[in-house]
Curated annotation (Swiss-Prot):
PANTHER family assigned: RIBOSOME MATURATION FACTOR RIMP
A GO CC term assigned to this protein in UniProt: cytosol
Protein's UniProt name: Ribosome maturation factor RimP
Native species: Parafrankia sp. (strain EAN1pec)
Origin superkingdom: Bacteria
Biased composition (Low complexity): 17-31
Keywords in alphabetical order: Cytoplasm, Ribosome biogenesis
Length: 308
């Protein structure tokens, strides 16, 4: 619709609503993602893995399927390789039996069929573990972060930084410094309860130095108003070795070889799974389902070319 502006020239008002094509593509991607999660989660859970995130993107003529898995007690490259074989079998139709559907449907099936693969054509499968700095979304993420330094942004905008002492299904207890560290003086901390329902975003902080205080022991306050003297007994489960002698450097020996700066994950707290940023995963296995008879060596990540 044309209209005359103040300058006397005609202006054209254009619609800013999203196109149907964009909305349709997003809906189709969400449907494929949901179908992948529905198929993969039962098998991964049975094998002792948690499916943290799954996504599908396009890279030229191929699709890139990225699956993030974790498990209690930590995950190493061997475990990631096991998860990769399991995911590959499910996607290739070798282990789709949870819904009692018919045959595998052949290669490149559409997502709508119960027995067909949700991925059309050739694809690259990436199975990774979460990065150290991944967002804390589920209670299990908090339990696995016990002993780590986290930053929490509450729904009211207040930020809290502290070390996770313990976590349950409702919230976590943090040891929060009450004052800046002073040389020759013990650092005093208070125990603050963080309820998951009040959290807008929370993430583990990457620590390249020691997690301990270099100067003396650490005093922990029972709450914001009452201080416990050094050596006083803490509530059950709260004393996790905050002292200089008993704390463990979880990142000892890690070096930033590539010189890249760490970036905060911009995913919202409510995003399902809380996938880690690219490059931050501890271990990764990549499979290319579209080439023939090519093998790459194991150098921190495993590449395997497969014919689908």
């Amino acid at each position: 619709m044309a209209r005359a502006g103040e300058s006397g020239r005609a202006g054209v008002r254009r619609s800013t609503a999203p196109s149907r094509r964009t909305g349709g593509a997003r809906a189709a991607a969400d449907a494929v993602r949901a179908e992948l999660r529905r198929r993969l989660e039962p098998s991964l859970t049975t094998a002792g893995f948690d499916l943290e995130d799954v996504s599908v993107t396009r890279a030229g003529a191929r699709s890139v399927v990225r699956v993030v898995v974790d498990r209690d007690g930590g995950i190493d490259l061997d475990a990631v390789a096991d998860a990769s074989r399991l995911v590959s079998a499910v996607l290739d139709g070798e282990d789709i039996g949870t819904d009692g559907a018919g045959g595998t449907g052949g290669s490149g099936g559409a997502a709508g069929g119960s027995g067909a693969s949700p991925i059309s054509g050739a694809y690259v499968l990436e199975v990774t573990s979460p990065g150290v700095d991944r967002p804390l979304v589920e209670p299990r993420h908090w339990r696995r972060a016990v002993g780590r330094l986290v930053v929490v942004r509450r729904a009211d905008g207040v930020e809290v930084e502290g070390r996770v002492l313990s976590a349950d299904d409702e919230g976590a207890d943090l040891a929060v410094p009450t004052a800046p560290a002073r040389r020759g003086r013990p650092v005093r901390r208070r125990i603050e309860r963080v309820v998951y329902a009040t959290v807008a975003r929370a993430a583990v902080q990457v620590e390249f130095g020691s997690a301990t205080d270099a100067d003396g022991d650490t005093d922990v306050d029972a709450d914001a108003g009452a201080e416990l003297p050094a050596g006083a007994e803490l509530p059950a489960g709260a004393d996790l070795g905050l002292g200089a002698e008993s704390d463990v450097d979880l990142d000892e020996g890690l070096e930033d070889d590539d010189g890249l700066e760490d970036e905060d994950d911009e995913d919202e707290y409510g995003a399902a799974g809380g996938g880690a940023p690219a490059g931050s995963a501890a271990d990764e296995v990549v499979e290319d389902h579209g080439a023939v008879d090519t093998e790459a060596g194991l150098i921190g990540r495993t590449g395997k070319e497969m014919n689908r």
